[in-house]
Regions:
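C-terminal nucleotide
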Residues: 1-63, 77-136
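Conserved phosphate/anionic-ligand binding catalytic regions in large, soluble enzymes, centered on
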Residues: 64-74
Length: 136
């Protein structure tokens, strides 16, 4: 757990560093290190998640890792905005199509399987009557 916490602090420092070169690659490497740790040290990955992470990296992700509780959940991949549509199409063709064709997922379920998202502020405390949700 210590190394994962250290990665969180490294990521925070990196995101705040305006002078950092190759920031996308560095952030991606932190994500990939996190996945390797989950897979190797904590054994909370699965063959399917490892395959998705590998395919993500082969298709231009800066980094990828399992997210959620593991043992079957999902991955998050760090992809450039201009590559996201091609990335989604490639992951669909190389992973999800075979599961769709085999009847393991339906077309309706597929819409919930792969989609773009953006970073957000995350969880916070909101004090009613305060205009600042972070520092009430």
């Amino acid at each position: 757990m210590y190394t994962e916490a250290a990665r969180v602090y490294s990521l925070k420092r990196l995101c705040g560093d305006e002078t950092s070169k190759d920031k996308f690659a560095q952030i991606g490497e932190i994500m990939s290190e996190s996945h390797r740790s989950c897979r190797t040290l904590y054994q909370c990955s699965s063959e399917e998640l490892d395959e998705l992470v590998e395919l993500a990296m082969e298709n231009g992700a800066y980094g990828a890792r399992l997210t959620g509780a593991g043992w079957g959940g999902c991955i998050v991949a760090y992809v450039s905005e201009n590559n996201k549509n091609k990335f989604i199409e490639n992951i669909y063709c190389s992973y999800y199509k075979k599961h769709l064709d085999a009847g393991k997922i339906t077309q309706k379920q597929l819409k919930n399987c792969i989609f773009p998202s953006k970073p957000s502020a995350g969880a916070c405390v909101i004090v009613l009557g305060s205009s600042d949700p972070v520092n009430p």
